[in-house]
Amino acid sequence: MELLLFVMSLILLTFSKAIPLFNHNSFYFEKLDDCIAAVINCTKSEVPLLLEPIYQPPAYNEDVMSILLQPPTKKKPFSRIMVTDEFLSDFLLLQDNPEQLRTLFALIRDPESRDNWLNFFNGFQTCSPSVGITTCIRDNCRKYSPEKITYVNNFFVDNIAGLEFNISENTDSFYSNIGFLLYLENPAKGVTKIIRFPFNSLTLFDTILNCLKYFHLKTGVELDLLKHMETYNSKLPFRSSRPTILIRNT
């Protein structure tokens, strides 16, 4: 739980019209040191470490990606490729990018521009595995076999910059539009981009609610986002009663 709490406390959580949870000028931000200290203490146990060193940027494994970036396996009908300014600027994200393959897969999965990029790489996974995908950073090229790339359920192996909530007022059926904000950067070109991946899941809603409530119980900090989520949760028809502490114990 401490590990999940740490992850949730470092990312930017927003609710509907961008209500910030943590920022440098907020009371919440001052509590991060306590949270980090708890995580450091937790990781002294024999439990395998699930996070990169706290004060260091993540070291990516080129052969491991989250399922958010897994390209579609089905070939789509070919249509025209729209060469827009945005499409051209995306090429700057790829040129000499140390994370070229990861960035390419993110663009292919981008809900806002996926049709264009799927047309550009139409059905590439249906080719012979011997063909593979070759990325080149300056004169350094590497060939990848798509079937050998490992996709994991842990979204945080990618550069997740935050989460975004748009929770519906309609509680007749569960709908919680949770978006993962993926940060892309090409340091060689000074280009950045944020891609939003919608991910609707009651389990994820419960997990985040548990983490925020645990943080509240441990620190006494009042969180606006927690109040909104608890209000919404209490109105769901399939919640028989409001939990006194956590929705789930695990």
UniProtKB/Swiss-Prot annotation:
Role, per record: The heterodimer glycoprotein H-glycoprotein L is required for the fusion of viral and plasma membranes leading to virus entry into the host cell. Acts as a functional inhibitor of gH and maintains gH in an inhibited form. Upon binding to host integrins, gL dissociates from gH leading to activation of the viral fusion glycoproteins gB and gH.
Signal peptide as annotated in the record: 1-18
Compartment(s): Virion membrane; Host cell membrane; Host Golgi apparatus, Host trans-Golgi network
Keywords on record: Disulfide bond, Fusion of virus membrane with host cell membrane, Fusion of virus membrane with host membrane, Glycoprotein, Host cell membrane, Host Golgi apparatus, Host membrane, Membrane, Signal, Viral envelope protein, Viral penetration into host cytoplasm, Virion, Virus entry into host cell
Membrane topology, as annotated: Peripheral membrane protein
GO BP annotation list: fusion of virus membrane with host plasma membrane; symbiont entry into host cell
Lineage: Viruses, Duplodnaviria, Heunggongvirae, Peploviricota, Herviviricetes
Cysteine-cysteine disulfides: C136-C141
Protein name according to UniProt: Envelope glycoprotein L
Family (UniProt): Belongs to the herpesviridae glycoprotein L (gL) family. Betaherpesvirinae gL subfamily.
Quaternary organization: Interacts with glycoprotein H (gH); this interaction is necessary for the correct processing and cell surface expression of gH. Part of a gH-gL-gO complex.
Subcellular location, principal: virion
InterPro entries reported in the protein's UniProt record: Cytomegalo_gL
PROSITE patterns linked to this entry: GL_BHV
Residues in gL betaherpesvirus-type domain copies: 31-239
GO cellular component, one term: virion membrane
